[in-house]
């Protein structure tokens, strides 16, 4: 099972478009939308299948929503993929198939399409550049995260990915690098 985690910090129409991109996939998923109480009230989430709304107390800032997901949803053997609310899933996400990886694999690094149509990939486990990796470029086993959380800073996703890489490598676990485009980076804000 893949848990897709989206923190809603923008308008609900971003969630509608994100849902359409998820619904087009052929994967076993549960979608968690983490948001504040006021934004939760504006969502018509009855139309979203396999979706759980998590209301986070306080404000939504940087990566606090993802951290809140990790605080309230325990390890159930799931893979976690963070879909920023301005990103959209790519149909090739179907090719990732995390259930086919060895139980020793704790992280899968994937590609992401940018507005320029360029594909952003990571070219090695030691080349996870903090300033160049986005949430949409990796999946992680929930158990591998443990107490680790995102830092509430710009590029926090890069630091998080780097820390997961270090923990995984140092514990003798595996990281897979898959040349598959999993999402569109900031797709909902592209100029048409």
Regions found by a protein language model. Name each.
Residues 1-21:
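N-proximal low-complexity "stem/linker" segments adjacent to membrane-targeting elements
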Residues 20-29:
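Short, acidic, metal-binding catalytic loop of nucleotide-sugar glycosyltransferases
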Residues 28-39, 54-56:
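Short beta-strand/loop segment that forms part of the nucleotide-sugar
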Residues 39-47:
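Acidic helix N-cap motif at the loop->helix transition within catalytic regions
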Residues 56-73:
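Glycine-rich, basic loop-to-helix element that forms the pyrophosphate-binding segment
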Residues 77-88:
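Short beta-strand-to-loop acidic/aromatic patch adjacent to the donor-nucleotide binding site
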Residues 95-122:
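Conserved donor NDP-sugar-binding/catalytic core segment of glycosyltransferases
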Residues 126-192:
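Conserved nucleotide-sugar donor-binding catalytic segment
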């Amino acid at each position: 099972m893949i848990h897709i985690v989206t923190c809603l910090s923008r308008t609900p129409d971003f969630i509608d478009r994100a849902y359409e991109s998820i619904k087009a996939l052929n994967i076993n998923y549960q979608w968690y939308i983490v948001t504040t109480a006021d934004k939760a009230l504006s969502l018509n989430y009855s139309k979203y299948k396999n979706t759980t709304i998590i209301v986070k107390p306080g404000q939504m800032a940087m990566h606090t929503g993802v951290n809140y997901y990790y605080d309230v949803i325990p390890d159930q053997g799931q893979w976690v993929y963070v879909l920023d609310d301005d990103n959209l899933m790519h149909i090739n996400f179907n090719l990732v198939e995390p259930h086919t990886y060895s139980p020793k694999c704790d992280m899968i690094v994937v590609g992401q399409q940018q507005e320029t149509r360029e594909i952003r990939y990571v070219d090695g486990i030691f080349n996870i550049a903090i300033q160049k990796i986005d949430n949409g470029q990796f999946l992680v086993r929930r158990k591998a995260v443990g107490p680790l959380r995102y830092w509430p800073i710009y590029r926090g996703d890069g630091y998080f990915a780097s820390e997961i890489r270090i923990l995984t490598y140092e514990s003798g676990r595996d990281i897979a690098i898959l040349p598959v485009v999993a999402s569109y980076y900031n797709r909902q804000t592209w100029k048409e």
